[in-house]
Structures are given as C-alpha cells and as structure tokens.
Amino acid sequence: MLIKKASDIRSSEITPQDLYLNRRKFLTGMAVSGAAAATGFGVKELLSPSMRASAGQKIDGIQKSALSTTEKITPYNDVTHYNNYYEFSTQKEEPAGLAKDFKTRPWTVKIDGAVKKKLEFGVDDVIKLATPEERIYRHRCVEGWSIVVPWVGYSLSELIKKAEPLGKAKYVEFTTIYAPNQMPGQRREVLQWPYVEGLRMDEAMHPLALLCFGMYGEVLPNQDGAPLRVVIPWKYGFKSAKAIVHIRFTDSQPMTTWNLANPPAYGFYSNVNPNVDTYHSQAYERRLGEFRPRPTQMFNGYDQVAGLYSGMDLKKNY
C-alpha cells in the first residue's frame, strides 16, 4: 500500500466526508459571544525567537513505561501536520505553519481553586517535577480517525498532589491560553474562547492520565499543544487540553468548550465508546496512513479505567 505523506492527505480522506463537512458547517454557523473577554490571560504582541521552544530539542532522561502500547507508531510528520487545533485553524493542515512562531517562553501555569496550596509554576519547573516517561498511547479523534503517539511526560497525579486538593474538589478544570494575537483562530467565534476542558478527580488521578510536554523524544511542537498539555488516552482527543495556563479544582462539573457548543455530540465524559453514536457511528475508526477501517475499542482499549465508571450508564453519561 502506498502511504501518503501528511502534507498530501486531505482532511476528507481521513475523516468521513459527510462528518467533516457537517462539523465545518456547524462551526461556521456558530455565534458565541462575550466569553473571550472573561479570561485574565494575555501575552505580548511581539515574538522573540529566543522565547520559542526549539523544534527538535531532545528531552534527557526519558524512561520507558509499562503503560505503553506495542502498536506501530504513527510517523512524526503525520502527527505534526494533521492537527485539530482550532485556536490556529479549523483546517488540519494549517496549524503547523500558523503555530511556528507561537511563543512558549516565558510561560506560567496557575493552580488554584479547592486546594490547600495555590501555586504558580514556570513551565520548566513543572517539567522538572517528576521523571519524564515515554508513553506510547493510542489517540482517537471523535471524527473517526486515530494515531499512535510516543508522548513524553509523567502522570498528571504528580502535579495534582503538589497542590493538595481539598476533600470537596471533585473536578479538575484546564484552561488553554487566550492569545488571539498569536492564535488566529481565536479571532473567530467558532468556539467559546479560551478553550476549557475538565475531568472528574478520579479520572485526573488515574495513572494513565498524562501531563505531557514532549513526543518522539523531543519537546512538543507548537501545533501539538506546546508547551504543556494533557493526554487522556481513553477519551476522544478534544478532552486533552493543550497549551495549558490554568488548572482549577472545583466541586462542580466544569462547563467545557465543546460540550457548550454541542452537548449531544460532545458529552462531558466523552469516553471512546463504539456503542455510543454522537453525530455519526463510532463503531469503526481509520488509523492515519491505513486504508482499511478497524473496529473501535471500548475506552480506546484502555480497560484499566473501566472501574472508574462502574454502575454508570455510559450512553446517558457520554
């Protein structure tokens, strides 16, 4: 089989055409106003090359992880040139170019809410909190395509424990930076900005939940969520917030971006589930670079998390 380079792949070849067009139509017709002004985050207009993460910069001291899959890894060029990152563009091929000058230094992560210790870390201090691990994870998009990526990071729980959450902290909310001067997609009201995602506390504390700052042994490329993101491999990709600047602990379920945009299609949990159809069938997926579709696995094949949802109706609690 001839495998195309990512630069040769059109979005409609991987995502079913009707789904791709329907999602674009939905986004184009949305009119969400006012939310962007509520954020307190901003960055300077001018960019300095010395303040950007260096492409191809190696990460030292990476350890292998028993949590990794042994499946074939998707080529680096494909993963870095086929991106859903609406802060830059709704076209998957465009974030790589539009994000090349995105400034990731200096970068501060604020942690607050229902915690004993309200913290502010420089991103490099966050990275040094624990030994980096390579986690080779399956990544499944709600649109029906998938990839396998060797992420680099450590369990999100390591950072959470530093803040010492209070007993009333039931959820964790993640907020992406709001920087329309650097992120052209944020100048359009295709979604409510800044991007917000959330997890239940036990989900965030699960060993599989990854705080990620690299992939393929190198620092994260800007178009893949630099400098800091989460990777939640048993959920659809939009649950894995990118370019995080704020982590908040709360006793109530966060109002998340895609759930606000279209609740029936983007549930708060959004666990990978072949038996729950959102706006299209989720029974099959197409691995990037492959011709034949493959059956979707429950929880994306990560059965370790099944106990988190014991007794829950996963169709109702999608």
Label every PLM stretch briefly.
Residues 1-22, 49:
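N-terminal secretory signal peptides
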Residues 47-56:
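Ser/Thr/Pro/Gly-rich low-complexity linker/stalk segments immediately outside membranes or between
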Residues 56-318:
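Structured, non-membrane catalytic/scaffold regions adjacent to prosthetic-group chemistry
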